[in-house]
Amino acid sequence: MNKLRSSAITQGVQRSPNRSMLRAVGFNDEDFNKPIIGVANGYSTITPCNMGLNKLALKAEESIKRSGGMPQMFGTITVSDGISMGTEGMKYSLVSREVIADSIETACNAQSMDGVLAIGGCDKNMPGAMIAIARMNIPSIFIYGGTIKPGKLYGEDLTVVSAFEAVGQLTSGKITEERLIQVEKNCIPGAGSCGGMFTANTMSAVIEVLGLSLPHSSTMAAEDLEKELSADKSAEILVSAIKKDIRPLDLMTKKAFENAISVIMAIGGSTNAVLHILAIANTAGIDININDFERIRQKVPVICDLKPSGKYVTVDLHKAGGIPQVMKILLNAGLIHGDCKNIEGKTISEYLQNIPDKPPTNQNVIRDIHDPLYKKGHLAILKGNLASEGSVAKISGVKNPVLTGPAKIFESEEDCLKSILNNDIKAGDVVVIRNEGPVGGPGMREMLAPTSAIVGQGLGEKVALITDGRFSGGTYGLVVGHIAPEAAVGGNIALIKEGDLITVDAVKQLIEVNLSDEELKKRKKDWVKPIQKYKRGILSKYSRIVSTSSLGAVTDL
């Protein structure tokens, strides 16, 4: 084992005052020669995603001690995307990714910690922790709080998206208010992150593929015993990694990020993975850009039938073999790199050695590579005169991802949702929600409420929705987000007028408004930059420093 970083606060006569403080929190003489390991605990009762984390943190703490380390627990924040969705509060969601990253980096570096075990549940916990881990490059491991089990109503599996869609179903007369309340009361049965292949489960899978969490751990249910056992094992592995000096940037290679992109395509993951992978890779100093997603999408099929557009939930994926089974199928097809290593020092080829070559025959969640749901990945990168830097379209569940129609312009999510619920949106429309980007929102809110209402009204195949904001992992339909440049910085999405014809063509990777360059230039001359909405506080700071979404909406370029 190399010299411990914590020796800066534990060794030598001059560090006697430092040691006195450590003795007060439980250190004894022999402990000053042990690695000090931060336990970044995202426990919170704000959200079901994080309410089960404390037991995992305590289990990990015990395991660190038993394995020869000294744990020091500290808290990180979380917000609940599901609770803040559709409100002003959602502007703080993406901002919280940076706060989480900054807080973990601050605590670990201020206290000269030798390693960190991060525990998270809700969407931004995972990328926030990974950004911090990449910045510090000290031995690290991530423990995912686990997925929620599906709710049940009359034999049907429910998720939180069921409740969002029920709102649209109610306003279009498809269900009664009584049914809406039944869905509301039954869709979230306990602890864990939203149960489909939404953002939290997508990002936990990304971390598993990158090698910074244990195999199979990203799809475990939050309330199952194996999740606690996995936390115990993760802590033990981290202590070993410190002794072996295995560091995050040893694992976060370009090949590893390509593997992660391949897996999110195969499992039908969230559009948010594009934003977060770009941010993590940027921090790690790895050259991954938005075009890599399109390149990989062209060759990797969707082989998992998972919600929101599919049938099954993440616990079903776990029973079918989890992420290792998906990876083994992709490895055999030559679609991922087998020489990338994980936190245990094993290559992908090594730790997948005992995974079956084909998915189990008694399940329908994971398909064979030759019988995919879709022959190409579902996250398409679209460019054109509305998105010269790129945009992200999610096209799973859409039979024909091509639509040309008149623009219906909204300057906020709230105005759009009101119009949808008033049945003002018709088949063939292209709904435009702008000034919701990283700078303009600020915070790049997720448009789950409008998209779910559209689907609930039966228009998911007949209407396109485009925005410089984001989408929840629970969104599906013909949707295009992350449009860059965004409206607030003068992107062409700011120049569209009501009724302009817009084409969304995921087959040709095209998004454009039917206007000449001359007309766009003329409109740009008349464009007035919006007044900054916030003068003080975190949203004001964020809007001044955040990058474009095509670079991951990072704050430390």
Swiss-Prot record:
Binding, Mg(2+): 81, 123-124, 446
Residue runs in coiled coils: none
Pfam families named in the record: ILV_EDD_C, ILVD_EDD_N
GO biological process, one term: L-valine biosynthetic process
Record bears the keyword Iron-sulfur: yes
Function: Functions in the biosynthesis of branched-chain amino acids. Catalyzes the dehydration of (2R,3R)-2,3-dihydroxy-3-methylpentanoate (2,3-dihydroxy-3-methylvalerate) into 2-oxo-3-methylpentanoate (2-oxo-3-methylvalerate) and of (2R)-2,3-dihydroxy-3-methylbutanoate (2,3-dihydroxyisovalerate) into 2-oxo-3-methylbutanoate (2-oxoisovalerate), the penultimate precursor to L-isoleucine and L-valine, respectively.
Family designation: Belongs to the IlvD/Edd family.
Record-given protein name: Dihydroxy-acid dehydratase
Species, as recorded: Prochlorococcus marinus (strain MIT 9301)
Gene: ilvD
